[in-house]
Amino acid sequence: MGETLGVGKSAVTYTDFAKADLIVIMGQNPGTCHPRMLTALEEAKMAGASIVAVNPLPEAGLINFKNPQRVRGLIGKGTDLADQFLQIRLAGDMALLQAVSKRVLDAERARPGTVLDHAFLAEHCQGLEEFQAHLEGLDEEHVLAATGLRSEEIDELAERYMRAERVIITWAMGLTQHKKAVPTIKEIVNLLLLRGNIGKPGAGPSPIRGHSNVQGDRTMGIWEKMPPRFLDALQMEFGFDPPRHEGLDSVGSIRGMRDGTIKVLVALGGNLVHAISDTSVAEAAVRNTRLSVQISTKLNRSHAVVGQEALILPALGRTEIDRQASGEQFVTVEDTVCAVHSSIGRLEPISDQVLSEVSIVTRMAKAVLGDKVPVDWAGFEHSYDVVREHISHVVPGFEDFNTKIRLRDGFVLPHAPRDQRQFPTPTGKAMFSVNELDTIEVPPGRLILQSVRSHDQFNTTTYSMNDRYRGVKKGRLVLFISPEDLAELDLADGGYVDVHSEAPDGVDRVLRRLRLISYPTAKGCVAAYFPEANVLVPLDSTAEGSNTPASKSVIVRLEPSPN
C-alpha cells in the first residue's frame, strides 16, 4: 500500500467497521486469530452492514459469532455474520479482485456516470486509464479456473460492492503468504479506488497483522529498509550517523547464517526456528553461528537450537510489574488500526533477577558502545518516559508522546489518506496499478497446501492438542482435505499420508504420517497446522516484493504412510 497510497497501514479505525455498508473479509480467520475483530463485525452487522467472507475454509468465526458478553451470545443462537461465502481456491484472490473490478468498469460503461466516483478519481487518483485498458483483456475462463468459483458468485459480490456506499476490505496472512501477495493487495486498492472507498468513514483497506505489536515495531524502525527521513531524524536526535545500507529480513538472515556471513544471532523475543519456513534449513543455519542469544519471556523450541555458544536471557513479560529507578514502568503498543495505548504489568515477577527487555538492551549497548555514542543508556533504563521523549522527536505522529499516551484510550496516529484524502506518493495522488495475473499451475494428482493455526494457539505457542472450531481432538498432525479430493486420490478419511512438497530446487521436503480429515475445504486445496507444516515450505519460496514466506501456496503430493 505504500506504493499506491503512500502509507502502508490500515486506512480505517476500529469505529469505521460499524459505519460500513459492506465488509469483505479475505484470507482471514478472525475467530481464532483476531477474536477482538468479531465484536467489531457483530456491531457492523447490527448496524446493517453486509459481510462477505472469501476463504478456502468455511471457518466458524466467519459464519456466526456468539458474543460471550451478550445474553444472546450466551443462551441464543448468536449473530450470523457472512451474507455471502466465497470458497476460493488458494492463490485465487488476485483473479477474483480483477474480475470484480472489471465488472464495476463494465457497469460504468453500461450506465455512464452512475457507478464510479468520478469526482474522487479526477481529484485524487492517477493511472485509471491504464488499469482499465489492462482489464479489457481479462479472460473469464482463466478467472474461474484460478478461483474455483462460478461467474454468478463473482457477479453477486460485484453487485454488493456497487450497491454499497462505504466498503472495507480486510485481510490477513491468507493473502500475504503467497508469491503474488503484493500485487494482490494492490488489486484491493484498485477496487476500492474505483468508487472512492478510501478517506471517508466506514471505508478503506484494513490489513490485520499476525501479532499484536508487529505494526508498532515497524513504526519504531524495526525494518531492514527504513527510509532516509527516519535515519536523518535519528542522526539529528542522537548525534551519530546510522547505517544507510539495507539490512536483512528474517528470510535473508537465515540465508546469511546458513552461508556463514552472519556469525551472531541476537533474538529479541520470538521463536525464530519454529516460526520461519524450511525448518531443517533454519535449524542448521542457527547452529552454524558462533553465538546465539535469546532474550525471551518464556522457553520455546529456539532455545534448543543454538550456535556454538549460546545465551538464554530471561526477560519480563508485559503482564509483569517492571520496576526501575524512577518507579513502575509501562510500555506502549500500536495495534493494527494505528491506535496506540499503554500496557502495564500487574503480576509480581518470578524473581528480582529477571530484567526487562529495555534493561537488557540498554545494558548491552552500554557495555559494547560505552561512550562512543552520545546516548544516555542508563537514563533509558531508569525511566521509559525518557525513551518516549526521544521517540516524540524522531517518529512522526508521536509528538507530545508522554502526554497523549496517558489519556484513557491512548491516541490514534495520523494517516493522511484516511484523514485528509492526501496521498504521500511521488505524484501526490493515489496510484492505480497494472498487475499481470499469474496463477499457480498444479500438476495432475497434486494439491495446494496452506498452513493454518488451531484455535487453542497463539503464533507458535500451542495451548492444547485440540481445535474446537474444526472438531479436531488429541492431535495436530492432521491434513484437512475435501471429500472430492479424497475420492479422486483413492484415499480414506482417517487414513495416514506422508506429505511431500514439490519445489523447483528438487529437495524432497516431507512431513510424515498426517491423519486425513475429510473437511469442506476448497477442492484441490489442503491445510495443515503451523508451525508443523513449515518443514514443507522452501526458504526461497517467498512473496515477490515483500519476501514473506509463501506458506499458503505449497504444491504437494500425498503418499500413503507405511504401516
Place the predicted regions along the sequence by residue.
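Intrinsically disordered/low-complexity terminal segments and short unstructured peptides
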Residues: 169, 260, 402, 424-426
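Short acidic, Pro/Gly- and aromatic-enriched capping/linker segments at domain boundaries
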Residues: 412-420
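Segments forming glycine/polar-rich beta-alpha architectures that bind adenosine-containing cofactors
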Residues: 422-424, 430-431
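A short N-terminal beta-strand-loop micro-motif at the entrance of redox/enzyme domains
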Residues: 435-440
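Non-catalytic alpha/beta scaffold blocks inside enzyme catalytic domains
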Residues: 2-201, 207-390, 445-448, 452-563
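Segments of small-molecule ligand-sensing domains
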Residues: 398-412
